[in-house]
Structures are given as C-alpha cells and as structure tokens.
Amino acid sequence: MVSGFVSDKNKTKAVQYKLSGHNSSALSSETVPAGQTECRENYGQMPHAMLKNTAQAEKYRAKPLTSQQTQTTMNTEANRKTEWVVGIGEALWDILPEGRKIGGAPANFAYHMSQFGLRSCAVSAVGDDEAGRELRNQLREKGVGHMLETVPFPTGTVEVTLDGAGIPSYEIRQGVAWDNIPFTPQIEELARHTRAACFGSLAQRSPVSHRTIGRFLETMPDGEGQYKVFDINLRQHFYTQQVVEESLRKCNILKINDEELAVVGSMFGLEGMQPGEQCRTLLDRYGLRIVILTCGAAGSSVFAPDTRSYIPTPRVEVADTVGAGDSFTASFLAALLSGLGIGEAHRLAVDVAAHVCSQHGAMPRLPERFTARLRNDGPAIR
C-alpha cells in the first residue's frame, strides 16, 4: 500500500481509491478457537522467525524457526525481557499487474524493520483460506516475524492498477480478516514487550480492529525510549475525525503527506496556515515528539520541538510507488532506535524510499549500502 511518498507531486492526484461492493456492516468480532492461531508456544506466544540475540537464534537466522526451536529460545529469561518493533493493522495481498504480492502498511513496515536487523513483528488477521496460509508462508520466507490471528473472514486483498508513471489506484475489499483483529492474550503479551509500534487509520475503519489497536497502544510500556508512530494513511472514506484525533492523542510521532495534511487541517481548523505552520501546530497541540511531512517531488520535512530537517526528493526512474512510504517510516524509526539523530534518520529514510520507488512491489530487498548504515552503529533492540 502506498502511504503518500511519490516521486512526482503532480502525479499524486492520479492516485484513486475505489471500493468493492462488500457490506461493511457484516463485520463481527467472532474468531475461531485460539488453538487455530499461529505461534501458540510458551511465554506469550511470541512470533517465530524473529529471534536475533541468542546463539540459537543466530544458528537458525537463515531459515524460519520451528515451533520447538521458538519455544526453547523464548523460555530464556533474556528473551522474556526482549523488546519488539511492531506493525499492527492490515496484512493483505496487493493484486498487481504482474501478480499478487504481500502488502498492507504495517506488514511492509515490519518487513523493512527486519532488514535493518531489528526484531520486528506484523500483527494482523487472515482467513482460514489459501490466501491466508500463503501469506504466512511468504512472511516466513522473507524472515518477517508475524502474529496473524485466524478469523472467519476472507484474507484481505487489494486490486492495484498502475498508470503509465507507476502511480497506483486501489480497489480495497471490505469485510475481510484484518477488519477483525482480536485482542488476544498473546497480542497483549507482545504489547507489553514492544518498544516501538506503527499503526494507521485504515485498519481502524472497523470497530474490532480499532479497539485492538487502541488496547495494544495502551498496553505498551511508556517512557522516553518508546515510540508510537501514527502513519496516517488516509484512504477514501475509511477514516473519521474521531479516529484521527484519538490516534493523534495516542501517538508520539505523526507521519503525513501534503494531501493528507490538507484534510487534517480542515478537520482541526488549520486552514489558511502554511504546511510547516500546520505541522508545528499539530506538534504542539498533541504533544508530539516528531511530525514527518512528505510532499512528493517537493521533498520532505521533519519537525521536532527544537529541530527542522528538510531534504529534497532524489530523482529516480519510478517502477511503482507501492510501499515507498512504509519504507520511509521504517527506515526513519530504525535509525532513531539505533541512536542516530533526526537529520541522519531523515537522510536514510529519503534514500530508502527513493530506492523502493525504483523497484516493483512493496517489499524489495534493500541493498547493503542502506542496511550497513545502521549495523555500524548497532540498533538498540537488535
């Protein structure tokens, strides 16, 4: 899914969001028995394929851990104190012209976090269907930790159509699994050990997932080193002022693009202000640590109480822009977690997002020149 980072601002107008004719009133909180959900090992049922700080995990890093290996590793006292980076919300299939690829902003975020060597996890829900089973398999193959609950709804899909410049339009199916993410004891335990989480507005279109995301954020520990990133991702009519305001009060970092900022500005009486002034107002009003504003070809800015960073958008040959914004968010946060400053984090995020725009799909493998920038400093929760 695109989250607002495109290489040509004038082309952002071409991005359209269409709905299929599914009835959203059919959403339900009913779930299948817990035993049918993946990752039911001891100690909080933490996800497998994510363990990176023990000798045993290092041995198996090149391939997914089995349930027995996960259970053994998770039972150590060191791992009971492990901190995770979590993307919570939609995990789905983007149906692209060249075939289907894993998508959903939180899943994309978790994938890119894992490329920087952090213990990341995608929290979502899938159906008891072929698409859900294959989504799990693909995440395993990509080395992405995941806690995907099985629910009696179809696995989410999005029909993606690309124009001649690689700018996508979407048909987002409703009444799907990620609309119904339950807040299980396993997800609650994961939240207690999460240092940074990224969430958006799209998965909050349904009351079930809205409640789960809210409870997850409330369960996370508080502290100066905790990050709750609201990557707003406004999609068609799948948001309300109430959801946006609640999310602004729960996060400490906001990521937004220029078109979304215009919508939010209208919501909260910020019309007539310059974009920078709008960002500063949101920063102050909601006590945020950072506001990230992306403006397509016009560049991007990062605002903090005593800092502003601006970087122009690099020129690249665009393959498609799917997932570029998610890679921006992940790279920026990974850099902060590794101890880099805002300017350095911003530079990495811009470079990674530009690279993702030059590739097909939301989850390309990042070159060593990007991932090595953080390995030299050592991410704090690797």
Describe each model-derived feature in a short phrase.
Residues A196, S201-T281, G299:
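Conserved beta-alpha-beta core of the PfkB/ribokinase-like small-molecule kinase fold
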Residues L19-H22, A26-S28, N42-P47, K52, ...:
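Targeting/processing segments of secretory and organellar proteins
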Residues K59, T66, T70-E83, F268, ...:
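Conserved phosphate-binding/catalytic region of the ribokinase-like
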Residues E189-L190, E246-S247, D284:
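Structural alpha-helical scaffold elements that stabilize or flank donor/cofactor-binding regions
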Residues K59, T66, N75-V144, V158, ...:
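Glycine-rich phosphate/adenosyl-contacting loop at the front of the ribokinase-like
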Residues R119-S201, E224-G225, R373-R382:
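Conserved N-terminal subdomain of the carbohydrate kinase-like
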Residues V2-Y17:
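Extreme N-terminal basic, low-complexity initiation segments
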